[in-house]
Every structure is written in C-alpha cells, then in structure tokens.
Swiss-Prot record:
Keyword set includes Lipid metabolism: yes
Subunit text: Heterotetramer of two alpha chains (FadB) and two beta chains (FadA).
Site-annotated residues for Important for catalytic activity: E119, E139
Protein name: Fatty acid oxidation complex subunit alpha
PANTHER family found in the cross-reference section: TRIFUNCTIONAL ENZYME SUBUNIT ALPHA, TRIFUNCTIONAL ENZYME SUBUNIT ALPHA, MITOCHONDRIAL
Length: 716
C-alpha cells in the first residue's frame, strides 16, 4: 500500500501502474475538504515513489465522485473573499498535481462523475467510462461556476462551443454523448472498466498514445481563431441570456470566464476562474440556490426515513377521473405502481385515460419514451365504473369535486369497499381533513394528499395530517408520493393547509392594490420581471380559474376572519360575478385566444378595466417597490405564522413548498431565505410601514423578538 486514508487508498499494480481508489466510508464519494486533503497527500506519496510509471483513478463505490460536499458550502462561503481566494487556489494545486505527474494518467469512471468529480477526471490525460456513467458540471444550477478548473480544461478538451453548452446548462451527459464530443476516450461494459483503463494506459506508456501532447493542449491557450471566438461567445451570450435572464448570473459569468481565459495558459486562466467563482459564491443567488439544494436533501431524507415506518404500497386507486384523476393515474402508473381509476361516468373515465395517453404520447414525441413503454404504463391503469377492482388496493386517492358533502359521501362509500388496512386520502385543496374524517369509521387511516395542477409538472405533494391520522398512515402516503417521483411535505390541518393558506394573503395584497387604483397588468409585469414569479397574480388567477380562486378565498375568509375576511367586493368577486373565470372560458383579467401552437395566448381586455374602474375609479401609478411590498408582505407573514403554529415543521420544508408548489423564484430561495437575506429587522421595519393596511401586514411578536436579537430563520 503506497497510501491509505479513510477516503483514498493507493496501491501498486502490475507493470508499475498505481491505482488510486476513492472509497469514502459513506454511501458515496464526495469532494469534501477531507478528501481533497487526502488526495493531496496521496499524490505526494505517488510522486515520491520512483517505481510508478502510470496512474489509474478508480472508485470503490457505485458512483465515481458525485461532486463537492455542498453541505460545506454555506459556512465556507460566509467567509471573506480574502479567505476564500487562497482556499480555492490551494485546492486547485491538488488538481494541477494530477496533471503534472511525470507519467500518463487515466480515470476509470463508473456512475456519476459530476461537478468536482468531473473536474478531477479532467485533470487526467485520458478518461474511460462504463455504460452507467453520467458526466457533467452542474454548478450553474447552484448559482456558481466550476471552481476546480472545469472552465479551463473542458473548453481545451472538447472545444469552446461544446464546453459552453455543457457548463451553462449544467446538464449531465450519458457516456455516448461525452464520447462523441471528446470528453472521454472510450465507453466499455462495467465489468471491463478497470482492465480497459489499464490497457489504454499501457498504450500511452508504449507511446502508441501521445499523452504529453494531450496534456500540453489542456494547459495551453484555447486554439480558437479570433473571429471565430468573437462569434462563438457573442452567440452564446445571446442564447444563454434568453434562458437564464438577469436573475441568474452564473451561466453568463461562465461564458465571460471562458472568453477572458481563452488566450491564457493554465495558471492565468485558473486565476480568472477562481476570482469569478468567489464573486458568485458571495451572491444572494448562490446562497439561495445552494439553500434549495440542501432543503431538498432534508425533505428527501425525511421521506426516506418515513419509508421505514410505511406499509408497502403496491397498488393504488384514484376516485374521480377527468384531467386531475388522469394525471394522478399517469404519475402512479408511469413510476411503477398500478392504479385503478374509478368514476361514476364513462365520459369521465375516457377523459382520464385520454389525459394519461396524451402525456405518454408527448413523452414519445420528445424521445423520452417508446410505444412499448407507453403500452406498459397504460396497462398499469385499470378504468372502472364499479368498486370491484378497488377492494384490494393499498392506497386510495379521492379526487372528486371540491365539495365537502360530495367528498364525505364518496369517502364513506369507498371505506365500505376496501380492505381494513387500506389507507384513504383526499386530494382536497381547501376542505378540512378533520371535517372529512368525520365521515369515516377509521379516521386514523385517513389523511390529505394534495397534488398540484398539472400533476405531471408540479413536483410538490402536501401530505396533510389530521388530528387522528396515524404515523403509519402519514409515513405510507409520504413514501407513496416519493415513489411517484414527487416531493412530499407533511403539514398539519388548517384552512388552506400550507400552500393555499399563504397564497391567498398574496392575492389579498394584489386585490388591495387594485382597489387603490393599480393596473393589474402593471402589477403582473413587476412581479414577473422584477420579483421573478413565473406568473403575476392576475395571470395566475386566470390560469388557476377565478371560480376556483373565489371558492378558496371564501374558505380562507371563514377560517381566518380577522385577517382574511372582506368588507366589500374585491377584484376576484368582480371577475367572478361577471363570469370571467380565466383561461377556462377565455376571459378573466385578460382575454384568451389560441395561438398557432394550440396554446392559450393572453391579451389585454378593455372590459376588465371597465369592470374594475366602475368599482375602484381611475387607474393610478405605483412604484415597483410598493407593488412588491404590498403583495409579498402578507404572504411572508402568513408563512411565518404557519411555522410558529406548527402547520409546517421547518423553514426548509416551507421554502421547498413555496418553490415547488407555487413557483416562488428559486433565486430568492423561498420566504425564509428571503427574510434572512433582507434581514429580519429590515423586514419588520418594512412591514410596519404598511401595518395600517390591516392584520395581514402585522408581524408576529416572535418575529419582533427575532429581529431584536438580530436572529435568522436558517442557521449558517
């Protein structure tokens, strides 16, 4: 053994070839500080052993290296730039050591080699991957750029255009695609990986492969004529800005870094990368996106833990077909859980099956599925008008019309037609789970399972715990949601649960602005372009359905009369009373027509302005800051109330719920990350400025206390 640590082992094989094996104690290899330090020491030991003539990097895990240890990032990035720059420079010395060894090197890549893992293999002269490999640089998804030489080595290896696409999109790539552009040198079967790597290394040792020329190319300026470079980088900037926009600076920074370093050799090129990496690491966007990644890991960890308490869900049923039922059936069946879709009307079943077929056909059109897979998924969906096929299922999802009496009747009926240990859930968006549980003999085997529309696109599922729901019930539904490919968060029962409860104060803030004469289109523009929502409040109401919003608003007003009760008509009432229900009947705040692609196209409609003007008077202009404050403060305070009341367990789960359930701008990280970034005291001061507008704008005592103590919701 040449070197051994808890994360790395180095031993000498035949023919004086050394094998460096990444093999950490956990389930995966990560490039944490300990591993980088071990790699540094291992390379020193390798360099000192004069017998070694070649080096192969391998992994003792099912994945090569999944990337850097992101759990270290937030604490690390909180330090000053003067501390971070030497840190990243020192880390890069380690990768340079790989590249500077006096003999040829190769990486044998299995499974994931992402981020720092991929940058590690870029430092070797050759790369060979097995058929399970996934390679890529996903740092831009975290608001960063590669920091261990990725922006320097990859363009010199695969060309500027290919490298720009790899780095700015942050996508991972299959080995065949990586081979095509030259990121790796061969693809082999997993059982042949190490032997093939050693064989290639021997070809380099016998000078059949010119490893020194390979190495020199990676360390030299980019081989790109000046005019071609100008065109490449200008085109890339235009295309990337169109996708990334002004709120996500990392992809544009990556282009600038590659462009600036194009004429430089390794040392100067790496310095350009270091400085840009550190600047991005200090941005609020990076903090927010890293926070989302960590929150996602926390939620997934909770779901995994729940799986240990859960009963097996091998079959399911959805009651109520149509678009929602069809979407739930598609999601369950496509992820491997057979599902019965029951309705009382054949046309509804046809609609549900049609929805599933449409979604599957779209997958085939995009090249993500095949007709054979489509047939298999459809065979996993059993459409029925009676309860016979439902009797042995493990979980039932009730998804009938949003009416308490109808739901209660259907729930009581299905309980008579399933096994004693079946779990029953309701896909209600507003009706109390405790109220619905009264219709059941076994309320302990009942909870809410709130999907968001469209089911196949929206990642969130709210699992709503009623006062009688058992831990096994909750755990089983969480596990089933995870199995469906969804992100489940557990919330306690209250009007609107979590997501709708915090959404409607936002709509109330919007309605208040309209009552004071604001233009709904101007509000939408500010909330989309400046704050970053995918849709402004008027457009969102049109898409959700103003009739749906009107009903939910009434539920919220009844549940929280002090804060959400209304004195008179608001904008939602006006639209509803005029039967302007949004996209569903082509008129809401906006008018809708169908474009050439068959998609709804929105236009301003004078009728909307006439209706609102008759109630609220002439339009007035509002500053962007006031529009943002008056819409967002109520949502933020209500979110904090949900945490304080125990409706949601942690800031992390709240923020994931908002990002995945409502489309809260990811670059802001969620409500709690947003407050922490602003500073709790600054937020309290801003809310106090608008406190005269009513209870929705009045912060809680606990918030004031946190502000006074200079506290935050997330701990660094």
């Amino acid at each position: 053994m040449i070197y051994q640590s808890p994360t790395i082992q180095v031993e000498l094989l035949e023919d004086n070839i050394a094998r460096l094996c990444f093999n950490a104690a956990g389930s995966v290899n990560k490039l944490d500080r300990e591993t980088i330090d071990s790699l540094n020491a291992a390379l020193d030991a390798i360099k000192q052993d004069t017998n070694i003539q070649g080096l192969v990097l391998t992994s003792g895990k099912g994945a090569f290296i999944v990337g850097a240890d992101i759990t270290e990032f937030l604490g690390l990035f909180a330090q000053e730039e003067s501390v971070l720059l030497p840190w990243i420079a020192e880390a890069n010395v380690v990768f340079n050591k790989i590249e500077d060894l006096p003999f040829p090197t190769i990486s044998a890549i299995n499974g994931f080699a992402l981020g720092g893992g991929f940058e590690t293999v870029l430092a070797t002269d050759f790369r060979i991957a097995d058929t399970t490999a996934k390679l890529g640089l996903p740092e831009t998804k975290l608001g960063l750029i590669p920091g261990f030489g990725g922006t320097v080595r990859l363009p010199r290896l695969i060309g500027a255009d290919n490298a720009l696409e790899w780095i700015t999109t942050g996508k991972d790539h299959k080995p065949e695609a990586a081979l095509k552009v030259g990121a790796i040198d061969a693809v082999v079967a997993p059982e042949n990986l190490e032997a093939s790597a050693i064989a290639m290394l021997k070809e380099a040792l016998s000078e059949k492969l010119d490893w020194q020329a390979r190495r020199a190319k990676k360390q030299a300026p980019l081989n790109l004529p000046k005019l071609e470079a100008m065109m490449s980088f200008a085109t890339a900037k235009g295309m990337v800005f169109k996708v990334a926009g002004k709120h996500y600076p990392a992809p544009m920074t990556a282009i600038s870094v590659i462009e600036q370093a194009a004429r430089s050799e390794r040392a100067d090129a790496l310095m350009v990368e270091h400085q840009a990496f550190i600047k991005l690491a200090k941005t609020d966007v990076a903090q927010a996106l890293i926070g989302i990644f960590l929150n996602d890991q926390l939620v997934k960890g909770k779901a995994k833990k729940a799986g240990k308490l859960a009963k097996n869900v091998d079959s399911a049923a959805v009651l109520g077909a149509g678009i929602m039922g069809g979407g739930i059936a598609y999601q369950s069946a496509s992820k491997g859980t057979p599902i019965v879709m029951k309705d009382i009307a054949q046309p509804a079943l046809d609609l549900g099956l049609g929805e599933a077929s449409k979604l599957l056909a779209a997958q085939i059109k995009r090249g993500r599925s095949t007709p054979e897979k489509m047939a298999k998924v459809l065979n996993n969906i059993t459409a029925t008008l009676d309860y016979a096929p439902v009797k042995d299922v493990d979980v039932v999802v009730e998804a009938v019309v949003e009416h308490p009496k109808v739901k209660s009747m259907v729930l009581a009926e299905v309980e008579q037609n399933v096994s004693d240990d079946a779990i029953i859930t309701s896909n209600t968006s507003t009706i109390s789970i405790n109220l619905l549980a009264k219709s059941l003999k076994k309320p302990e085997r009942f909870c809410g399972m709130h999907f968001f529309n469209p089911v196949h696109k929206m990642p969130l599922v709210e699992v709503i715990r009623g006062e009688n729901s058992s831990e096994e019930t909750i755990a089983s539904v969480v596990a089933y949601a995870s199995k469906m490919g969804k992100t489940p968060i557990v919330v306690n029962d209250c009007p609107g649960f979590f997501v709708n409860r915090v959404l409607f104060p936002y709509f109330a803030g919007f309605s208040g602005l309209l009552a004071d004469g604001a233009d709904f289109a101007a509000i939408d523009k500010v909330m989309e372009k400046q704050f970053g929502w995918p849709m402004g409040p008027a457009y969102l109401l049109d898409v959700v359905g103003i009739d749906t919003g009107h009903h939910a608003q009434a539920v919220m007003a009844e549940g929280f009369p002090d804060r959400m009760g209304k004195d008179g008509k608001d904008a939602i009432d006006i639209m509803f009373d005029s039967e302007r229900f949004g996209q569903k009947n082509n008129k809401g705040f906006y008018a809708y027509s169908v474009d050439r692609r068959g998609k709804p196209k929105k236009d301003l409609d004078p009728t909307s302005y006439e209706l609102l003007g008759a109630e609220f008077g002439d339009l007035k202009a509002f500053e962007s800051d006031e529009i943002i404050a008056r819409t967002m403060i109520p949502m933020i305070i209500e979110t904090v109330r949900c945490l304080e009341e125990g409706i949601i367990a942690t800031p992390a789960e709240a923020d994931m719920g908002l990002v995945f359930g409502l489309g809260f701008p990811p670059f802001r990280g969620g409500v709690f990350r947003y407050i922490d970034t602003m500073g709790v005291a600054n937020f309290v001061a801003l809310a106090d400025k608008y406190a005269h507008l009513g209870g929705l704008y009045q912060v809680t005592d606990a918030m004031r206390e946190l502000a006074a103590n200079n506290g935050s919701y997330y701990q660094a």
